Curated annotation (Swiss-Prot):
Annotated site residue numbers, Important for catalytic activity: E118, E140
EC number(s) on file: 4.2.1.17, 5.1.2.3, 1.1.1.35
Record's protein name: Fatty acid oxidation complex subunit alpha
GO molecular function, one term: long-chain-3-hydroxyacyl-CoA dehydrogenase activity
Transmembrane regions: none
Length: 715
């Protein structure tokens, strides 16, 4: 074989053929169309060697099997027919693997996703390592697609239809023990013996067909299948609001295969894959994937990062506890927490304990691994143990004098190279650094709550922050498993600045008489994961509205919230979910009582709660203000590119991913249409909808935020 081949065949002395997968020059193995010739040549050799007792497919990469198909192949397709042909080519290769007369085993270590799992499904048996890096899944739905190389047909027959639907409709990834439990793999072994165990499995021969659990057998029958698909279709529709066509096609294709046979199923799969590849939703989701991949590679600045072995955290509250957890347990860094009392330290330690104990209970990690990770975290009520910290993150109250005091204390008690990162959500970083002896080592690092779940962080340098400080902070964020965007030190930074007008408009709709649940439902239908009123309840009404006066002082009336409404709600001791009452009422913690709108909220703000506007009208008002503010942020260089703006909105506030982010969405609409809608709304509802100068200029020139092949509009 050519040395540049991604697939290499070696026949062992025991007459088992080992096919090593190693895409040249790439960290991850991905399947490309041009590999078809290589694979076919190897399969031909296998068929011609009558002495072979079995075949093992294994990766030569240290931490992945096959991470999926190369998504660029789909982008290169100019029509649904081309994408369908691509799927049929993949199906044919998998069919040839399955048709081999000798037993074929997939030996899996690391990520086995998408086309990688489809290849493993085409093998007769599967074995994987018990390593934390090993995950198996079909995540195509997250790109607006479905598995196109036979996955929709083979998976239901292997693990049962309900398990397969759950995996394919959500894109969820199974850990080794889960994969074994559902029958996706035959064995789970230590990494050190993977190859030998796979060879042994190949020599044993093909296993008898696994008996599915009784429940799965019932659901595979005509009556059970009809009921299952009806129920899943209804549930999926409620979740996607019809915004993701891939989910409907997945259900249709799997049901076709089960009802009419796999041949019809493969045809339906390839056809649906081709059609979905051309949808705007898939294109937008793939753009988000590429943009997030680019952001994760972006070092933040041209400088080399400084040392980063240990981190300090000031404050053991909710944010401090979450930051300590992701730094130690995801980043693997030593963490020292300082709080004014032992209660705060214990709270932060318990936060990590609870997170890790949940993982132990779910058998994601062992107790020994939990203890090892917890050992990275310690605490103190003074600065003992801080002298060698490379970076200190403060997560104390939003009080400028207090944060300036923290800077002074860190400079006094830590090393000269220690970086001070503030988790402020509203205070200017330049003000926090105003009295610093080393202002070049002060930076903002804005996390979102809950820290362990929210993927985005904003990295905020002020005017004199050094390039090395930026690079080191970005490196830390990546270690914590976050997606960092670098934003300017202006009031509200980026995410809160575009979120505030959206929330304010929702409150205005409420004061005009619209119902809470109708406003939330309108924005969920538009594509947000939760509505704006519910979001305010989840964040905490006191916390979520704290930034409004800051933004109003910086940018004027367009950021003013409806007079007295917020004050009335806060004065009535309504903080949202955290104290059980906000716009909604919440049941006792631990009980499964649903949240309900509190009718008293209408009396409190002096309205009747009767809907007048359509869902589309309500969504338009909230979203157009967000788009207008995003365009201003782009113009003022608050964000470095449209790419960062889209990632910030999708990962930070749940802007509908199928629209690609605010800038992709504005490009889809066209600047002229965005301006026309804003001008119409300004005439109806006031000056806050007046389109910004950037949008007016772009509409006049016919410009876009994303230029072909570029990350943003070039000046």
């Amino acid at each position: 074989m050519d040395m540049t081949s991604a697939f290499t065949l070696n026949v062992r002395l025991d007459n088992v053929a080992v096919v090593s997968i190693d895409v040249p020059g790439e960290k991850m193995n991905t399947l490309k169309a041009e590999f078809a010739t290589q694979v076919r040549a190897i399969l031909k050799q296998i068929r011609e060697n009558k002495a072979l007792r079995g075949v093992v497919f294994i990766s030569a990469k240290p931490d992945n099997f096959i991470a999926g198909a190369d998504i660029n192949m789909i982008g290169n397709c100019k029509s649904a027919q081309e994408a369908e042909t691509l799927a049929r080519q993949g199906q044919q290769i998998m069919a040839e693997i399955q048709a081999l007369s000798v037993p074929v085993v997939a030996a899996i270590h690391g990520a086995c996703l998408g086309g990688g799992l489809e290849m493993a499904l085409a093998c007769h048996r599967r074995i994987c390592t018990d390593d934390a890096k090993t995950v198996l899944g079909l995540p195509e739905v997250q790109l607006g697609l479905l598995p196109g190389s036979g996955g929709t047909q083979r998976l239901p027959r292997l693990v049962g239809v309900s398990t397969a639907l759950d995996m394919i409709l959500t894109g969820k990834q199974l850990r080794p023990k889960q994969a074994l439990r559902v029958g996706l793999v035959d064995e789970v072994v230590p990494h050190a013996i993977l190859l030998e165990a796979a060879v042994e499995l190949a020599i044993k021969g093909r296993s008898a067909q696994r008996n599915l659990p009784v429940r799965e057998r019932i659901l595979a029958g005509p009556l059970g299948r009809t009921l299952l698909f009806r129920m899943v279709s209804k549930k999926t529709g409620q979740k996607t609001q019809g915004n993701y066509p891939a989910t409907e096609r997945i259900l249709e294709v799997i049901e076709t295969g089960l009802a009419q046979g796999s041949s019809s199923g493969y045809d339906a799969e390839a056809r649906a894959f081709g059609e979905l590849a051309m949808t705007p939703q898939s294109q937008a989701l793939r753009n988000i994937f590429f943009a997030s991949t680019e952001v994760k590679k972006d070092p933040g600045s041209d400088a080399q990062p400084g040392p980063l072995a240990s981190v300090g955290v000031l404050g053991g509250g909710l944010m401090g506890g979450g930051i300590a957890y992701v730094t130690a347990c995801k980043g693997g860094l030593s963490v020292r927490i300082k709080d004014i009392n032992a209660k705060g330290i214990n709270h932060a330690l318990k936060y990590s304990w609870d997170q890790l104990e949940t993982k132990v209970r779910r058998r994601h990690i062992k107790a020994g691994e939990r203890d090892k990770q917890l050992a990275l975290i310690s605490g103190s009520t003074d600065y003992r143990g801080f002298s060698h910290r490379d970076l200190v993150i403060e997560a104390v109250f939003e009080d400028l004098a207090l944060k300036q005091q923290m800077v002074a204390e860190v400079e006094q008690n830590c090393a000269p190279h220690t970086i001070f990162a503030s988790n402020t959500s509203s205070l200017p970083i330049g003000d926090i650094a105003a009295n610093a002896a080393r202002p070049e080592q002060v930076i903002g690092l804005h996390f979102f709550s809950p820290v362990e779940k929210m993927p985005l962080v904003e990295v905020i340098p002020h005017a004199t922050t050094s390039a090395q400080t930026i690079a080191t902070t970005v490196k830390l964020a990546k270690k914590q498993g976050k997606t960092p965007i670098v934003v300017s030190d202006k009031a509200g930074f980026y995410v809160n600045r575009i979120l505030a007008p959206y929330i304010n408009e929702a409150i205005r709709l409420l004061t005009e008489g619209e119902r809470v649940e109708a406003i939330d439902a309108a924005l969920v239908k538009f594509g947000f994961p939760v509505g704006p009123i519910q979001l305010l309840d989840e964040v905490g009404i006191d916390t979520g509205t704290k930034i409004i006066p800051v933004l109003e002082a910086a940018y004027g009336e367009r950021f003013s919230a409806p007079a007295n409404v917020v004050a009335s709600i806060l004065n009535d001791d309504r903080k949202g979910r955290k104290n059980g009452r906000g716009f909604y009422l919440y049941g006792v913690k631990g009980r499964k009582s649903k949240k309900q709108v509190d009718p008293a909220i209408y009396r409190l703000i002096g309205t009747q709660g009767q809907s007048r506007l359509s869902a589309q009208q309500m969504a338009e008002r909230c979203v157009m203000l967000m788009l207008n503010e995003a365009a201003r942020c782009f113009d003022e260089k608050v964000i470095r590119s449209a790419r960062d703006g889209d990632i910030g909105a999708v990962f930070g506030i749940g802007f509908p991913p199928f629209l690609g982010g605010p800038f992709r969405y504005m490009d889809t609409l066209g600047a002229g249409e965005v301006v026309a809608v804003l001008q119409r709304l300004a005439t109806q509802y006031g000056d806050r909808f007046t389109p910004c100068e950037r949008l007016l200029r772009m509409a006049e020139r016919g410009e876009r935020f994303w230029n072909s092949g570029e990350t943003d509009l070039k000046e």
